[in-house]
Curated annotation (Swiss-Prot):
It catalyses: tRNA(Arg) + L-arginine + ATP = L-arginyl-tRNA(Arg) + AMP + diphosphate. Its main location: cytoplasm. This is Arginine--tRNA ligase. It comes from Borrelia turicatae (strain 91E135). Keywords: Aminoacyl-tRNA synthetase, ATP-binding, Cytoplasm, Ligase, Nucleotide-binding, Protein biosynthesis. The keyword Protein biosynthesis applies. Gene3D superfamilies: Arginyl tRNA synthetase N-terminal domain, HUPs, Isoleucyl-tRNA Synthetase, Domain 1. GO terms for cellular component: cytoplasm. Monomer. It holds the Pfam family DALR_1.
Length: 584
């Protein structure tokens, strides 16, 4: 709604400025209209900077403002304040329009078309099959899932992709440890999820390697056997990968993370080699004296000199590929399959240099333009005791974290719910809300120190707090339904409380927040918005009697406002992959 009003004002102001420029014989290349919220609400709802136009048109601000007011008409209340023109909306009409729009559009409220028809691929998660998902993976997963939903809400045609890394030396490490220490155990025999069992052997290998100098040679021998297709080795590889992937998929299901396409690296890693050989034929890369195929990539420098380059190997002298080569094959595969306009990689900040190089080479080899590829880098998730290290077992496993948080809430939940299954479901939903919100609320590029107690807080900027406000509003609406008050046309003119107006303005900005989150590729924008709305409603609820059986008209209006708040909060929760609960 606010977007529509701003667009209307922009069109009318632009028209006025163009007409004035024509009269002044001034040519304008671009009209930049700056709108913002006034510092105080009593000054208006929007403030428009006029001073810049005064300089360009060589006219006083009062003359320009007078002409703009003529163009705007009586639809808005206007007031000149120095270099600004302040706009006040017609509150009665605005409140009615917003509440009706939200309650009619329901889950579609906030959806827009700024990315209409844009084909977007987003690759995220991309786990290794040598360990279970940990809290760092959870941050990757929730960023990818949430951003996908935000991009879809803005009209994008989004395809979610997961590339599972199921080959290489790190996989061979678990295979070697299983051969030495496994004793033919299985997930069923060990009473463990497959990914957790595999993770145990990854840790065992690293313990073994500390005291055995030949461990690395054993890994290389095992890798060679796998590459040669040795039957026994491939059979073991398939078995362990199957256990790991089944376990990882269970965690995806638990956390409500989904993908449109899952690739296995073992099935596509050879494609990149052909791309390099074709590039060599076309003269896009070159062969070094030792037989390695290389390309020159620019070196970042602060010197004011000609661009410097360094050599980058794409195929080793023995014909084997590097990770970058395999990634080039992945880009081509997806370009052919989906013909994307943009591909986003959600990968940690430690890979920034890799992706800069990858995107440059992909462009030079003619696979796709560099600006069609995006590395959405995110900060690491650290523990109070320091950085996580999977090889040492120093991690918070995703499954264990969810279980731990669920158990922490069960004592309180059991006081309110006698049914064991209901209690467990509520506890799980609270823990997921806590984790997803906590991992999204910090700006993506920043590192996080995960704090379990803070994530579970019901009184602060947290997922459980948002869930609680949603459940509280649902309780209000249930009480309203029980009263069965005589229904009639709702009189929204009764909503004259300043807190009500503040809430309405926040609701009306929802679409703008989604657009900004999509353009910035930043789900934390929606997190901050959801907290702002929930906090505003909580303050309103504390100070205001929403249901008053002695005043049915006002009750109808206030409960309809509450419905609009709840719907908007639910829409936020969907974008953030936070479970909504009617009761907590």
């Amino acid at each position: 709604m606010i977007s529509k009003i701003k667009k209307d004002l922009e069109n009318k102001i632009s028209k006025t400025i163009k007409e004035l420029a024509l009269k002044q014989n001034i040519t304008l290349d671009k009209i930049n209209i700056i709108m913002k919220k006034p510092p105080k609400s009593e000054l208006g709802d929007l403030s428009i900077l006029i001073f810049e136009f005064s300089k360009i048109l060589k006219l006083s601000t009062s003359v320009i403002i007078e002409e703009i007011i003529k163009q705007i008409g009586k639809k808005y209340t206007t007031k000149s304040m120095g270099a600004y023109l302040n706009i006040k909306f017609n509150r009665k009409e605005y409140i009615k329009d917003i509440i009706k729009k939200v309650n009619e559009q329901k889950e579609k409220y906030g959806i827009n078309n700024v990315l209409k028809n844009k084909r977007i691929i987003i690759e995220f998660s991309s786990p290794n099959t040598n360990k279970p998902l940990h809290v760092g993976h959870l941050r990757n997963d929730i960023i990818g899932e949430s951003l996908s939903r935000i991009l879809k809400a803005s009209g994008g045609q989004v395809t979610k992709i997961n590339l599972i890394n199921d080959r290489g030396t790190h996989i061979c490490k678990t295979m070697l440890a299983y051969k030495k220490f496994g004793n033919n155990t299985t997930p069923e025999l060990s009473l463990k999820k497959g990914d957790h069992l595999i993770g145990d052997f990854y840790v065992k290998y690293n313990e073994y390697a500390k005291n055995n100098k030949m461990a690395e040679d054993e890994i290389q021998q095992l890798l060679c056997k796998w590459e040669e297709g040795d039957e026994e080795t491939v059979k073991l590889w398939k078995k362990l990968n199957k256990w790991a992937i089944e376990g990882i998929k269970e965690t995806y299901k638990l956390t409500n993370i989904t993908f449109d396409k899952i690739y296995l690296e073992s099935e596509i890693f050879k494609i990149g080699r052909e791309i390099i050989l074709q590039g060599l034929e076309k003269g896009l890369c070159y062969k070094r004296e030792d037989g390695a195929i290389c390309i020159n990539i620019p070196i970042e420098t602060n010197e004011m000199t000609d661009q410097k380059f360094k050599q980058k190997v794409l195929l080793r002298a023995n014909g084997t590929s590097i990770y970058l080569t395999q990634d080039l094959g992945n880009i081509l595969t997806r370009k052919n399959e989906f013909d994307f306009d943009e591909m986003i990689y959600v990968v940690g900040s430690e890979q920034i240099h890799h992706f800069k190089t990858l995107f440059y080479v992909a462009d030079k080899l003619g696979i796709t333009k560099e600006n069609n590829l995006v590395h959405l880098s995110y900060g690491m998730v650290n523990l109070p005791t320091g950085k996580m290290k999977s090889r040492e077992g120093h991690v918070i496993d995703a499954d264990n974290l969810i279980h731990d948080l669920s158990e922490s809430t069960m004592i309180e939940i059991k006081k309110r719910h006698s049914n064991e299954q209901d209690s467990k479901k509520i506890a799980l939903n609270i823990s997921l809300g806590a984790i997803h919100y906590y991992l999204l609320k910090t700006a993506i590029h920043k590192d996080i120190l995960f704090n379990k107690e803070e994530s579970l807080s019901f009184t602060g900027n947290s997922g459980p707090y948002i869930q609680y406000v949603g459940a509280r509003i649902n309780s209000i609406l249930d009480k309203y339904d029980e009263l069965n008050l005589p229904s009639k046309n709702i009189n929204f003119d009764l909503l004259i409380n300043e807190n009500e107006w503040a809430i309405i303005k926040i609701i009306s900005e929802f679409e703008e927040y989604i657009i900004k989150a999509a353009k910035d590729r930043n789900p934390s924008i929606i997190v901050n918005y959801s907290y702002l709305l929930a906090k505003s409603f909580s303050a309103y609820y504390q100070d205001t009697k929403i249901i008053d059986k002695d005043n049915p008209e006002l009750t109808h209006a206030r409960t309809d406002l509450s419905k609009a708040v709840l719907q908007t909060i639910k829409n936020c929760m969907h974008l953030l992959n936070i479970p909504y609960m009617k009761k907590m």
